[in-house]
């Protein structure tokens, strides 16, 4: 049994765990492992937004243009494509890229082809919305959890390997305790989302500044290779409750501290749906994510179902990754997106102060 925290990230703990040292988890789970050369990763959520069906071809082409840019020097080591319909009826194509270090992502994003595409006046006049939500957690600021050991998705795809069975799972509070930084830091949030350029009500280009210790969760489901019984388990038992919980967070986020919640379906380069999905949730703080997870009926039902079936899972793949970030390691930019998009909804403007 291993700790979820890599040996090179372990230090004397000043904050106590929720369980005794003798705790044994009820079933096996694993985490991604990176060597000590990995200091910081970058997660880039690059979106194309449209509303009318006749805009779909242009939106898909814009998504392909973004993906093509990943082939340039210093592009991400891994990426995936997703689709989401928000509660305003807009469709969003989201390209998610992962880099193993900040410098390569900076070189890529500031290269002439990439920077000129995002900064072009065409982005303001082509009838589509675009957004960039880019965050860069340090190695001690993110954690992963997998119910499987091969072909890790998300940030796991840029890690160097997989752990053995880990101790910190199966109890409330284990998510926090998988963060290396949790050994000595409560990860308390401070500040607010603030619009620092543009006006969401007007449109055009808008930039939002984040604050310390915003939390981001990506919680995924992969039933592509599942047999009939596991497909039924996911589609008939897990998904309805999961959808209910995700819709609640999408529509009632401000009441519980959730800035943005998108339950997305993976797609291929032509926009066809794949049998994979995940949730993208931005939270004002990790403790607010914890409070919702531990108290909301929909998540409790999901958690109970997972506990019941986890030990017997074969080809239904469930996982999550959770990160927190310093304010300086976040960029939220929106171009002609509706004002309820992403971090725009809860960001305050100068006029509101």
From Swiss-Prot:
Comment on pH dependence: Optimum pH is 8.0.
Coiled coil: none
Cofactor: heme b
Outcome after substituting residue 178 to Q: Retains 36% of wild-type activity with Z-phenylacetaldoxime as substrate
Reaction(s) the record says it catalyses: an aliphatic aldoxime = a nitrile + H2O
Keyword Amino-acid biosynthesis assigned: no
Active site: 320
Residues that coordinate or bind an aliphatic aldoxime: 219, 320
The enzyme's E.C. designation: 4.8.1.2
UniProt GO molecular function: lyase activity; metal ion binding
Cofactor binding summary note: The substrate is directly bound to the heme iron.
Residue positions binding heme b: 299
Thermal profile of function: Optimum temperature is 30 degrees Celsius.
Keyword tags: Heme, Iron, Lyase, Metal-binding
Activity modulation: Active when the heme iron is in the ferrous state. The activity is enhanced by reducing agents, such as Na(2)S, Na(2)S(2)(O4), 2-mercaptoethanol, and L-cysteine and supplementary additions of electron acceptors such as flavins, sulfite ion, and vitamin K3. The effect of various chemicals on the enzyme activity is different in the presence and absence of the reducing reagent, Na(2)S, which acts not only as a reductant but also changes the substrate specificity of the enzyme.
InterPro entries reported for this sequence: OXD
The protein's enzyme class: lyase
Pfam families for the chain: Dehydratase_hem (PF13816)
Functional note: Catalyzes the dehydration of aldoximes to their corresponding nitrile. Is active toward various arylalkyl- and alkyl-aldoximes, and to a lesser extent toward aryl-aldoximes.
Subunit structure: Homodimer.
Similarity comment: family membership: Belongs to the heme-containing dehydratase family.
Protein's recorded name: Aliphatic aldoxime dehydratase
Organism of this sequence: Rhodococcus erythropolis (Arthrobacter picolinophilus)
